[in-house]
Amino acid sequence: MKPVALAVAALVAALSIAFRADAQEPIKIGIIATYSGQFADTAQQMDNGVKLYMKQHGDTVAGRKLEIIRRDSGGPNPDVAKRLAQELVVRDKVDILAGFPTSPEALAAADVSAASQKFMVSMNGTASMLTTKSPYVVRTSFTLPQVAQALGAWAATKGGIKKTYTMVTDFGPGIDGEQYFQRGFKESGGEIIGSVRSPLANPDFSPFVQRIKDANPESIFVFVPGGSQPAALGKAFADRGIDPTKIKIMSSGEAVDETAIKGLGELAIGRLSAQHYDYNHRSPKNEAFVKAYNAEFKRNPDFFSVGGFDGMHLIYEALKKTVGKADGDSLVQAATGMQWESPRGPMLIDPETRDVVQTIYIRRVEKVDGKIVNVDIDKIENVKDPVKASK
């Protein structure tokens, strides 16, 4: 054989070996979450969604094994989340970043995603600006403006509420929620009579709730992050005699998720909320999801759970489209525009913003067959993130 032919044959053989080796290497997914601290339960629920999806669909996609590497931020701690993201990319050589029960940590990790060109799936981070921080970030949760503006408009047009007071946590998602609830409410004819913000870390809600009580509002819109804070705020309302059957209390879903309702008991009855998911949502897809989740984890799923479940669905389907290619450009191109039927209902990854377009459900807490649950009373379909939709 001539030298040139030998060289070509050697090159082809080398490329073939390299291709086979790459095909056999696992795709590494680094999950950053608050596995300890005040938001530990939210991280666990999100991670349960990840685990359930992988149990149902296996750990191999497009001929490549998936390897999950979990890291605890102990947060919310953006600096730690950013360091963990850097370590996952540089030391552990992950292909995909995922997780993020809190927005501050998702925003910090997005800088690493942008710099390293790594695909990143936010399974819960709700700050609207998140997807603008990196062209490789895709969201499978929701944005606070998405639910808050929808709730504000509904309250003024269908809820019979004309005046309200707002109280939110003083960080990105809370400020988003305040601004866009007020926009939806005022544009639909409602009046804001006062606003107050509470700190993110270990807040004492008492003085803020007292200010609201002194204003004697017809209704209140609140946002606090998930975890232990919703029940603590609800108890502060009760301690000061604010009764949701007399003064309408409205919120996004965190304030009336199952954990909060367990902490509040009958104090939760009558509360109104807007959210994209609740385990009590009636559909065959969700009933199957809840049954499987209960069997595996002996508890009900929440919106953190469905965010993790749908986040893994997005990763699996994107990898199928790329036939196992896990670079950021290939995966984000495969993910944008993707549509599927989730336990929450129909989902679309907006091809322009990489946010979720989905149904927002208006719910009221009621006692049904002896159980205190959220009951869907209305829905708003095909809701986009209004921050980007208005630009």
Predicted segments — roles?
Residues K2-A9, F19, A23-K391:
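Extracytosolic ligand-binding ectodomains
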